[in-house]
Amino acid sequence: MTQMLTWRDALAQEKTLPYFQETLAFVARERAAGMTVYPPAKDVFNAFRFTELNAVKVVILGQDPYHGPNQAHGLSFSVKPGVPAPPSLVNIYKELASDIPGFVIPNHGCLQSWAQQGVMLLNTVLTVEAGKAHSHASLGWETFTDKVIKVLNAQREGIVFLLWGSHAQKKGTIIDPKRHHVLKAPHPSPLSAHRGFLGCRHFSRANALLEQQGQQPIDWTPTLPAA
């Protein structure tokens, strides 16, 4: 069996391409000019840092990072410890409470413990200017995260992809449903959650699919990282 690739190996060539270098340079220029860009530079690639390529069991695709102060830390839907859960995450917790027996809604919104169990929390755009949703949407991040999904699709099998909303579902057309499991629902935002996100049971369904493959299920109760 060949050695399983790491993200570093799998994306090394992509990171040398002009579009990627230009994206990083644009973000660096904005920060240097005094603009506030979220998440902080050290957190931009946290989805890859916390969930190595060979450890990915589940992928939850987000869109772009939260654009309010102290929220975004490089994991889709997650916020830093001490920051209230934003509305979409409140609805994710509501669904978990109805779907997973014994789930107690936590008093925080940090999902790092999911990432450390193999849930890749991937935004399709990795930076945003403070207060301006989708401000970095056309930089090149989408091309990069398309590559990430292609790598997951080709290098791995049996991943459970949770695609919430039209943006994630469009992105998910890259995924081969014969190799992977694709679960779709409306976005958990208050605008659409009642159209079928609430009641989708994606969390128990993901665990059932993992167990069918002989894998450990995810403990969906988020625990705070040790200080």
Curated annotation (Swiss-Prot):
GO terms for cellular component: cytoplasm. Its EC number is 3.2.2.27. The keyword Hydrolase applies. It catalyses: Hydrolyzes single-stranded DNA or mismatched double-stranded DNA and polynucleotides, releasing free uracil. GO terms for biological process: base-excision repair, AP site formation via deaminated base removal. Keywords: Cytoplasm, DNA damage, DNA repair, Hydrolase. It is an enzyme of class 3 (hydrolase). Belongs to the uracil-DNA glycosylase (UDG) superfamily. UNG family. This is Uracil-DNA glycosylase. It comes from Sodalis glossinidius (strain morsitans). The gene is ung.
